[in-house]
Amino acid sequence: MKRLWLILFLFFSPTLGQNIVTQWNSKALQRLMHEWDVKREKMELHLQASMRRTGIDMWIIMSREFNLDPMLQMFGDYGISGWYGHRNAYIFFDPGNNLPLERTLLGTHQSGRMREFFPTIISYGQEGLKPHLADFIKDRNPKKIAINRSRTVSMADGITVEMLAFLEDAIGPVYSSRFISSQDLIFDYISHRTVAELEIETEASHRTWYILRRAFSNEVVTPGKT
């Protein structure tokens, strides 16, 4: 009954209702932007080191519209990467010699904050992705190219059969013979937490403990009745 009165009150008070919706939207946007900041910080702090520990100098993540690779969740996710573009290639390259990690997007339909994760963006038109991808790989001549293909780890198995065939055709047999699974890189990257990640995990564990403690306590459980 109280919920009904609340709904009716909000319905007949459009200004108040709009203010509440605005506050909810504002909080949701703040959480989303904080999530992006946490993911970007992790990438900047740990990805290049993880690639070096696992002996990988290039990592290619392929994606198509509405068929995103699971690992793109680590690099922005919805509103940043993965959901847009006819065909997109998200490429990380370690040039060595104490040079910073190259973070490049080859694709279309980039969102506003894309450059925070991928500062270099190469767009294509009717010529398609293939020539840009071929030139990019050839110019850098990577020794090991990680792709998201794995028999045992689902989050490291995001590339589709079609996208793998497209990638192999684009870069040719010389470079496609250098493909390795990204699973070791992904494990290493995920396992190295930032301070912000640890704070989130700690808060989540505290909330989980509170829910479990209350769920099995006499606050909600009555012996012989519940």
Residue ranges of model-derived segments:
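Sec-dependent N-terminal signal peptides
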Residues: L4-S13
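A composition/biophysics-driven feature that prefers long, compositionally simple stretches
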Residues: Q18-T226
